[in-house]
């Protein structure tokens, strides 16, 4: 069994995705939660954008509309919505964000996705004389964004796309941002396309600096949510370490923290249970996402605890609070890290501020 095949099996057993007909992937409960967090993270990217919401009508696959999208009715409707609903942002340069369902997912060499899929689209309307400058800047920003989400940033690269002979490179440009899994194949996580629009009286904006009316050039970014979710999950699993763990970005991990209670003295079990419930309330109130179920796992000994921590590692949970009878006496507990598999001692009064600072940084 190859390394990537082991990752597929591990992610399926952990409840992130499964293989269905025609070797296509379907997200399971943990995978859907990860996709939801990734979608929210994308929404916060480039916060000055005008958010136009979701398009109800399904669209054709993105590869068909790579350069023809400015002629689509959806694009026209979005532009009119910008001018009407966001007049202060209707200047060049500006950003539009919208989401749409696609009935036909794009294919890649590593896996397919069971449709339909959600497209996260950003349209950057820029001054024509600075279009290439903006295009290169957007490439760099997007690649950095993906690298920050990755457990192995070096696997991401920018791949220029060949243009048809009838397309002028001054008017059309396209690149893919791809993540590589060695000999197993590559996955495109984002497509960037530049289209220069000429002589369209219905598509004009004032230049934000000069006030001159210009014909914007459009740079479009398209992210296929389900495909990129599976790619990032594979990224977190395919790390080459000896340990079986899922190295998800702390911000995107479906569960950020767990509570493990080592209960070796039955006489103190009620007090330990009360303490666990208190910690659970504190962490929930702070907005941290606890592990599945009630977030608390009771263990009897060190061996049982080690088995539980292996399970949390495979779920990608970054931190686990380990409490025992000693915690009742002096307030000290262990904060165990998924990435290092080491634990540090913290005081109960440090919860949740210490954890919140970790996730903010």
Curated annotation (Swiss-Prot):
One of its GO terms (molecular function) is DNA/RNA hybrid binding. Disulfide bonds: none annotated. Pfam families: HGTP_anticodon. One of its GO terms (cellular component) is cytoplasm. Keywords: DNA replication, Mitochondrion, Transit peptide. It comes from the Eukaryota. As accessory component of the DNA polymerase gamma complex is involved in the replication of mitochondrial DNA. Does not bind DNA. Essential for mitochondrial DNA maintenance and larval development. This is DNA polymerase subunit gamma-2, mitochondrial. It comes from Drosophila melanogaster.
């Amino acid at each position: 069994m190859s390394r990537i095949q082991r990752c597929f099996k591990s992610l399926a057993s952990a409840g992130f995705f499964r293989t269905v007909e025609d070797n296509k992937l379907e997200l399971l409960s943990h995978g859907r939660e990860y996709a939801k967090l990734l979608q929210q993270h994308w929404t916060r990217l480039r916060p000055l954008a005008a958010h136009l919401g979701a398009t109800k009508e399904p669209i054709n696959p993105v590869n068909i509309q790579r350069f023809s999208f400015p002629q689509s009715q959806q694009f026209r409707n979005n532009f009119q919505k910008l001018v009407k609903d966001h007049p202060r942002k209707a200047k060049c340069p500006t950003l539009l964000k919208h989401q749409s369902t696609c009935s036909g997912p794009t294919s890649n060499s590593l896996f397919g996705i069971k449709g339909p899929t959600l497209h996260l689209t950003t349209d950057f309307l820029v001054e024509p004389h600075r279009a290439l400058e903006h295009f290169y800047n957007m490439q760099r920003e997007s690649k950095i964004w993906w690298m920050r989400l990755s457990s192995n940033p070096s696997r991401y690269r920018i791949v220029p796309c060949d243009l048809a002979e009838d397309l002028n490179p001054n008017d059309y440009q396209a690149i893919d941002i791809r993540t590589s899994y060695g000999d197993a194949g590559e996955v495109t996580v984002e497509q960037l396309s530049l289209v220069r629009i000429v002589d369209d009286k219905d598509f004009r904006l004032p230049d934000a600096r000069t006030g001159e009316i210009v014909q914007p050039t459009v740079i479009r970014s398209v992210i296929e949510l389900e495909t990129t979710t599976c790619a990032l999950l594979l990224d977190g699993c395919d790390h080459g370490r000896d340990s079986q763990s899922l190295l998800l970005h702390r911000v995107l991990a479906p569960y950020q923290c767990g509570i493990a209670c080592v209960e070796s003295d039955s006489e103190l079990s009620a007090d330990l249970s009360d303490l666990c419930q208190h910690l659970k309330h504190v962490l929930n109130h702070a907005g941290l996402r606890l592990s599945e179920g009630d977030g608390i796992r009771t263990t009897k000994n060190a061996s049982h605890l080690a088995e539980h921590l292996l399970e949390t590692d495979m779920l990608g949970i970054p931190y686990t609070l380990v409490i025992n009878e000693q915690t009742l006496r002096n307030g000290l507990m262990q904060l165990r890290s998924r990435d290092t598999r080491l634990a540090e001692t913290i005081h109960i009064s440090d919860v949740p501020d210490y954890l919140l600072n970790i996730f903010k940084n």
